Amino acid sequence: MPSLRHLLTLLPLTLAAALAQAEDWPAPIKQIEAKGARILGKFDAPSGLTGYAAQYQNRGMALYLTADGNSVIAGNLYDAQGNDLSSAPLDKLVYAPMAKEIWAKMEKSSWIQDGDTNAPRIVYLFSDPNCPYCNMFWEQARPWVKAGKVQLRHIMVGIIREDSAAKSAALFAAKDPQKALETHEAAGKGSKLQGLDKIPADIEAKLDANMKLMEELELRATPAIFYRDDKGGLQQQQGAPAPDKLVKILGPK
């Protein structure tokens, strides 16, 4: 499973970047910015240093300006007990805003609801109609969904077989997409779902946008599952989870 921190850095932090660009950074920090880093904020640091959070080459990076303001040190800072003093500031200034942006992008994507709209927990997954592991996760999630505790949102794509996109289009085009998805998944290998012969332009645009988002996140397979942990942090699971991970993703039964 890819590192979530790596995943989060794949999307542009447009708002934070715009705000950061308005700052007049010290000369050494400007030099790092000139090399392609985005300076996203400043934080307190020990020993007379001043910390700066940056995004560089799809990674969060900590910068430390020396007390005289003439030099900058790049990298994580550790105390005498081996505690990483850079992790928390990077989480707050870099990774947390990126996680929020990813969640917002998934909210705006085209998905099929699976479960109660008032369910307290929402889980997104990129799903292909021909994906056996998507079907496995659908089955795994039934106790939570039927109890009204979880709403799955299936971001439909077409990557596994030649007819995958046409089948996703058929689900989107159904009079009741939620019911059509339930019928398809409940049938498993016996599904009678037929792909559309011709995909309407509006549905094709939805599928294209979903695929673009999947590519932005550098996801290679389905299901790619996104959920929030007990602290509200964004987490990802690639593939159908092991049974012992279900509670982390779906919450208590």
Predicted region positions:
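Short Fe-S-cluster ligation motifs
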Residues: 162-174
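Structural signal for short hydrophobic segments within the conserved structured cores
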Residues: 233-235
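Short, internal strand/loop/helix patches
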Residues: 173-197, 201-202
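Extracytoplasmic thiol/disulfide redox context detector
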Residues: 2, 21-164, 183, 198-222, ...
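Short acidic-hydrophobic, aromatic-tinged amphipathic segments that line or gate anion-handling sites
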Residues: 171, 237-238
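Bacterial N-terminal signal peptides that target proteins for export
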Residues: 1-9
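Catalytic His-Asp charge-relay segment
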Residues: 224-226
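Bacterial N-terminal signal peptides
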Residues: 8-16
